[in-house]
């Protein structure tokens, strides 16, 4: 028996050696192919990035979302078009943005490797193929059109009033307010009520804290890791909730809360209860014109998960960044109040966003808030399958993932001089001179894959700014520009230290 065991050990080691050698040979051959035979072999860029995902993995996973700044360095060395990994081209040219993020004139897919980490394969946001995406977006577009958002305006204003009453409470008690948490509660209340027909009143929670947001923020921390290893996230998602809770409590809470919402909707539908008739998900589930496979509760639940994230954290951050800069510059605050005072017959501070969109200085403040908060800060590659793209002397083969980074577009000094300065006046001046700066706001991306909730987000930002600016005096508390400066690129931008929340004290109610 001992002889048998001793013989099996060398055999086992030999087998392991063969496996390791085979895998190493595969990696070496793959690297050689990527360097010398790959269709992108002639594009400029560092050889280390071209051999595979290792270079990007080091900067984004090991160094916590720093690959963007390495890409910026690459562009300084190699020019405006760079091969940033084995398969992807990155372009640093804001004028080329609308070519990559194209409209209906071209079929544009998403890149599988870029959306796999989201673990919501049936959501529009994670849908790869152009035709499937167009079908899924056509289902939801009517609910997020400008007309639909206008009909939703009273509900938005009701939640803003609720936030104002909470802010007034903090004023009486001299409490510090985390605006990021407050605005996240506001936007989450609006989007969950509209999409699911259920008002969770996150604004009523102490400190505006709610577990769904904590879960989302926790998942953002792991975005890059799950981007390289999506199978891990998908495996965790399939585990029973008690086991999932041991591994990742935030993910467990998010999944369990979504299941509770689904159960509530099932019960409502089974009873023929029309109380939720205005919710997006119930209307979609009951719409016979939608193909059956596209109106299942699981698929629309995936849509809801992405809408809660996209409709909560990014809009909330734009509001926080904007309020910081407005409060930090008394001249800007004064100009905004004077402009709001020009609106006729508004004594209560309750506005229509159609009115507010006509105010040039406020519009400039809204656009600067979006520009300096960036929205999703990650690369979002697009794939033109049916045609080659041309950039300068380079022909980009069909099927190649191509991206531009929002942060680099928003901080381009040729488009936005002194790009880190919050300057609503630049938009007023551009409008007077007939210059279209709007096309360089990429917070919602562009083209057929543009963010579904763009109209809702703009309405929320306009209405919230107007109400808070006219209702309260506030002072910034223990927050500096460094807290807003993007250093780490996770799913959204993050500062060098901490979480970068904007804190204020409400000192006076003036309306």
From Swiss-Prot:
Tell me the CDD domains matching this sequence.
CYP58-like
Q: Where does it reside?
A: Membrane
Alphabetical GO biological process terms: terpenoid biosynthetic process
Keyword terms of this UniProt record: Heme, Iron, Membrane, Metal-binding, Monooxygenase, Oxidoreductase, Transmembrane, Transmembrane helix
Q: Which cofactor does it need?
A: heme
The function of this protein is: Cytochrome P450 monooxygenase; part of the gene cluster that mediates the biosynthesis of flavunoidine, an alkaloidal terpenoid with a tetracyclic cage-like core connected to dimethylcadaverine via a C-N bond and acylated with 5,5-dimethyl-L-pipecolate. The tetracyclic core is synthesized by the terpene cyclase flvE and the cytochrome P450 monooxygenase flvD.
Q: Where is the signal peptide?
A: none
Q: Which reaction does it catalyse?
A: (1R,4R,5S)-acoradiene + 2 reduced [NADPH--hemoprotein reductase] + 2 O2 = 2,6,9-trimethyl-13-oxatetracyclo[6.3.1.1(6,9).0(1,5)]tridecane carbocation + 2 oxidized [NADPH--hemoprotein reductase] + 3 H2O + H(+)
* Residue ranges of the TM segments: 13-35
Pathway note: Secondary metabolite biosynthesis; terpenoid biosynthesis
What does the record give as EC number?
A: 1.-.-.-
Q: Name one GO cellular component term.
A: membrane
Q: Where does heme bind?
A: 451
Entry's family note: Belongs to the cytochrome P450 family.
Q: What gene codes for this chain?
A: flvD
One example of the protein's molecular function in GO is: oxidoreductase activity, acting on paired donors, with incorporation or reduction of molecular oxygen
Organism for this UniProt entry = Aspergillus flavus (strain ATCC 200026 / FGSC A1120 / IAM 13836 / NRRL 3357 / JCM 12722 / SRRC 167)
Q: Which Pfam families match?
A: p450
Membrane topology, as annotated, equals: Single-pass membrane protein
The name under which this protein is listed is Cytochrome P450 monooxygenase flvD
